[in-house]
């Protein structure tokens, strides 16, 4: 599979990559090719893609409700895509589900960690999301070598202008 194999998409189709009213996400020609490739292979048109060169990965954002269709039962479709692209694209591929609210998006970004609540606050001139994570899932929310929290910070900044995400422990009140 070649990264140059395009379908009949036009640049005008990129309106779908703009999510929040008044918020424009810039898509480069290279990212556009990744979006087309993802769509052609998995049958789901992603909303956005970010190339994280530091972690050597592509992070695709799909519409709410499209995550299951994109990865397939047991992750089968995504595993097939990774296997087919192993020689052409030496990057890991991650998929996250978009949400119309910044709180919901942060919860999705930290998945599979259990996040019962997210608060968006202003701290000085910064916008900070405080994610309350179930104590047992704190390491899951951060991820191996901080990969998951880095991903969350990149995409929260890109889509909602959230400057930082902090993890707090969620404790359930005891009776």
Placement of each model-derived feature along the sequence:
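RNA-contacting regions in translation and RNA-metabolism proteins
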Residues: 6, 10-175
């Amino acid at each position: 599979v070649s990264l140059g194999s395009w379908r009949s998409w036009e640049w005008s189709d990129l309106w779908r990559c703009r999510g929040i009213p008044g918020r424009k996400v810039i898509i480069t020609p290279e990212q556009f090719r990744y979006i087309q490739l993802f769509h052609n292979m998995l049958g789901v048109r992603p909303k956005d893609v970010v190339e994280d060169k530091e972690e050597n990965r592509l992070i695709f954002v799909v519409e709410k409700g499209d995550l299951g269709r994109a990865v397939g039962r047991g992750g089968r479709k995504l595993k097939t895509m990774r296997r087919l692209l192993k020689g052409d694209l030496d990057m890991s591929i991650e998929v996250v589900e978009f949400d119309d609210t910044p709180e919901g998006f942060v919860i999705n970004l930290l998945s599979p960690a259990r996040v019962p609540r997210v608060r968006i606050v202003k701290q000085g001139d910064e916008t900070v999301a405080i994610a309350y994570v179930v104590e047992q899932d704190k390491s899951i929310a951060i991820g191996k070598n901080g990969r998951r929290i880095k991903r969350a910070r990149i995409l929260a900044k890109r889509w909602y202008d959230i400057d930082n995400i902090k993890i707090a422990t969620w404790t359930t009140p005891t009776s």
